[in-house]
Amino acid sequence: VEYRLGRTTGIPLAVVTGSPLQSLAYLDLHADTQDQKGNTVAFIGKMGAGKTMAEKRLCAAIAARGGRIIATDNSDEREWVTFVNSIDGVRRQIVDTAHPKLSLDPLRILPPEMAGQVAQSFLLTLLNLETIGVAGTTLAKVLKPAYMRDHQITSCGRLARHLAEECDLPEATAIADRIAVFADIENSASLASAIFDPDLPPADLSADILIIGTCGIALPNAEEMLSEHLFRQLPPHKVFGRALYALIARLARLVCFSDRARDAAFIVDEFHHMSSSPEASHAIDEYVRESRRANAWLITGSHDPEADYPNETVRNLIQHRIVLLCDNINLAQKGVEFLGVDPKTSPEEFADLVKIALNPGGPGCGLYADQHGNVGEIRLLRPAYAPHREAASSNPPEHDQETA
């Protein structure tokens, strides 16, 4: 177990409790970039262990340094909305897919040179079309910037009308019929409005902080994804959820990579929702591979590192790994292995760390494997600014975490 962890400058992350001097561990995006390290942070632990508090604190710290944030909010209470409303001096946008007041239609929120490609990816997933099939080829043609300009296609709704009434390309009306299924609020509920309602103003992706509420979005389970029969019978709202998570991941890449002179972070609590969509997982893979060159973070929260990070590329590129309270021996063992400790080559250290993971000392306490693979005991810092601390609390007050 190490006494010195993390960086010596940057954003204060935690007190290294294993150190006699109670030193601080810092996260430093620019130092990681210069050292050719990845920019991914993963918090592992049971509900109430302190993951979300830490994610929100990093959000505020990055925003205070002039960075940009895009985050998902899967909570019933809209806890991320509450938190970002406590951050002063930033432009924020809230897109709540359960009660949409802003549109996420890629043809409305992105410039024409990007919009068609992102919309094509979204619609291929939503409509379950093959990229090089007849319908997929038609979709690619009508979403080219010049074609959209010539035919005044400025929204997904307008695209559907064009395909249904004005387009002579093969299978155009069949594509329009498929879109109509998902654009029907009786089939897709509020998700239909979030993309296809022309009366909603478009979300502003240039905002300093963009929160996308994902509460209530249903996704296919593992059995449905693996069974062709069950997959074909998926209800529209589950198909829509799968496509929407992939769209969010692609939007995050565009937002966070848009200005390489400015730090940015994509924050995903409850990461299993994102990784359960194969298309979203692929987009996350691309994000992680390229994030170092763009000065962009990926910050995630998870209960189970083995199940929630099935993409080996993403898992191997996570440089900062924090394991907090685990509620059973199986998850504690997975957590310690996730830290890089091998139970076969280091059985005594492994057993000792599993005991810590099962009883780390309270919310925010746990183990940290830093960018060099050093592992030590820590206590995560809570926000020092009282309004942030109060707004960040998604549980009863945690009196045993320090602030900074």
Spell out what each predicted region is:
Residues 65-67:
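Conserved SF1/SF2 helicase motif Ia
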Residues 344-399:
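Conserved P-loop NTPase
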Residues 69-71, 89-94, 209-211, 321-323:
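Conserved beta-strand scaffold positions in the cores of enzyme catalytic domains, especially
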Residues 76-106:
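P-loop NTPase switch/communication element
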Residues 1-39, 383-385, 395-404:
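Basic- and hydrophobic-enriched, low-structure N-terminal and domain-boundary segments
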Residues 1-24, 74, 85, 102-289, ...:
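P-loop NTPase motor domains
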Residues 104-107, 221-225, 333-335, 379-381, ...:
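Short conserved micro-motifs at the rims of enzyme active sites and ligand-binding pockets
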Residues 30-61, 70-79, 98, 227-349, ...:
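Conserved P-loop NTPase motor cores
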